[in-house]
Regions:
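Small-residue-enriched, tightly packed secondary-structure blocks
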Residues: 1-200
Length: 200
């Protein structure tokens, strides 16, 4: 949770080379996967764990944990650990993240997200994507194609965190209180996205 918060803060601190505000304004959910790694122990070579929070009628939801694996994007990062961010930009993207498991590019359409001021003017993603994907590797933040990557619910870690089994949809729709340990992360997400709406 703390690692995901750090990734978000560092990426958003790069004012001219970050997620464009028009995308932040439309976001329905955000998934952050710190240090996605490449290794032979997973089919497809890539594996990572992260957290998801979704926008509700009264703010941002308590988080749940996810796993990401597979895909053919490893060549894009040179085999290095990389931080990933997935932004759901409409209700279809949100519905994908509510599923037990889905494949990017198959069950949900995705595109490499635009970055910075040039990305602010781009609207191509509105026509084609439910999810926008970003990576940060060795300090470089950019859109990345994650087609073929599977995203699944990490029920075990979520249960450990909450102390009881949780229904992911129930949590992400705002029906579960944010645990004290997750408040800084959720507050950070709300802060950055509120800034976007305020045009700051």
């Amino acid at each position: 949770m703390d690692a995901a918060r750090t990734v978000l803060d560092q990426i958003m601190a790069a004012k001219d080379h970050t997620i464009p505000m028009n995308i932040l304004e439309q976001a329905t959910c955000v998934a952050i996967v710190p240090s996605m790694i490449k290794g032979a122990f997973v089919f497809g070579g890539q594996y990572g764990q992260g957290v998801v929070t979704c926008k509700t009628g009264h703010g941002w939801s308590a988080p749940v944990f996810i796993r990401m694996a597979g895909g053919s994007w490893g060549f894009q990062i040179g085999g290095q650990a990389t931080d990933l961010i997935l932004v759901a930009v409409n209700d279809r993207g949100m519905q994908a993240l509510l599923k037990n498991k889905f494949k990017i590019g198959g069950d949900a359409s995705a595109a490499a997200g635009p970055v910075g001021r040039a990305g602010q003017a781009s609207t191509d993603w509105k026509m084609s994507a439910e999810l926008l994907s970003y990576s940060r590797n060795k300090g470089l933040f950019a859109g990345i194609s994650l087609d073929g990557t599977s995203v699944s619910q990490n029920g075990d870690d979520t249960q450990t965190y909450y102390g009881t089994r949780q229904n992911f949809e129930n949590v992400l729709k705002g029906n579960v209180a944010v645990p004290p340990g997750a408040v800084p992360f959720v507050r950070d997400v709300a802060h950055h996205f509120t800034m976007a709406k305020a045009g700051e």
